[in-house]
């Protein structure tokens, strides 16, 4: 089924980062394909990633009311069929901002538990990796991170999940390579959107 409405979440402290440019390329390509996009820039939204007792899951109470921020952000997800998450891979994981979003918003009684689930049919993760692909694969990180993200989605009832790794996003060997390599990264995410 072709995606019609994407919820695009991204996390990077700098609005002019490569992560921001990749998120923008995804947004633009989706619009070219007549896909509606709602974008959540966690940093510019001033999202608070810190879990508080108010938002801590209550395993005995599926009807728990969480903070207004959590319910507002969860309600934004409801009218979308596809989630795209863009983030830099720091220490082989999410930035704390994105982890906090997942912990707080994809909460028990909302995104999972007792028949609850995220409203998406598809999730696409786009991870920006600083190092080279060969080392990333050889050390097992590509498989480990892919398995982790896909299994998280499976736990939430979403089987159509995939990960795009954009490697070599920190080190470039000169301006010419930089420009052409940047275009190749954009091409990868455009292809990802086209396949939605």
Swiss-Prot record:
Family: Belongs to the NAD(P)H dehydrogenase (quinone) family.
Alphabetized UniProt keyword annotations: Oxidoreductase
Oxidoreductase recorded as keyword: yes
One annotated Gene Ontology cellular component of this protein: cytosol
GO terms for MF: FMN binding; NAD(P)H dehydrogenase (quinone) activity
Alphabetical list of Pfam families matching this protein: Flavodoxin_2
Source organism of this protein record: Escherichia coli (strain K12)
SUPFAM superfamilies for this protein: Flavoproteins
InterPro entries, sorted: Flavodoxin_fold, Flavoprotein-like_sf, NAD(P)H_dehydrogenase_qn
Protein name: Uncharacterized NAD(P)H oxidoreductase YcaK
Protein EC: 1.6.99.-
């Amino acid at each position: 089924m072709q995606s019609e409405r994407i919820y695009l979440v991204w996390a990077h402290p700098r609005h002019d980062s490569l992560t921001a440019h990749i998120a923008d390329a995804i947004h633009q390509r989706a619009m070219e394909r007549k896909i509606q996009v709602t974008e959540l820039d966690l940093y510019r939204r001033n999202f608070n990633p810190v879990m508080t007792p108010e938002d801590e899951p209550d395993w005995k109470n599926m009807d728990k009311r969480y903070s207004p921020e959590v319910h507002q952000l969860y309600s934004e997800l409801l009218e979308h069929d596809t989630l795209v998450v863009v983030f830099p891979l720091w220490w082989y994981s999410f930035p704390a901002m994105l982890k906090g979003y997942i912990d707080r918003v994809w909460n028990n009684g909302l995104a999972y538990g007792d028949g609850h689930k995220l409203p998406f049919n598809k999730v696409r993760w786009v991870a920006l990796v600083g190092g080279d692909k060969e080392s990333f694969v050889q050390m097992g990180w590509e498989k480990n991170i892919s398995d982790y993200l896909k299994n998280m989605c499976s736990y939430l009832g979403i089987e159509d999940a995939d990960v795009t790794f954009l490697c070599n996003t920190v080190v470039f060997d000169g301006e010419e390579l930089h420009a052409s390599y940047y275009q190749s990264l954009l091409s990868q995410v455009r292809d990802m959107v086209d396949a939605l």
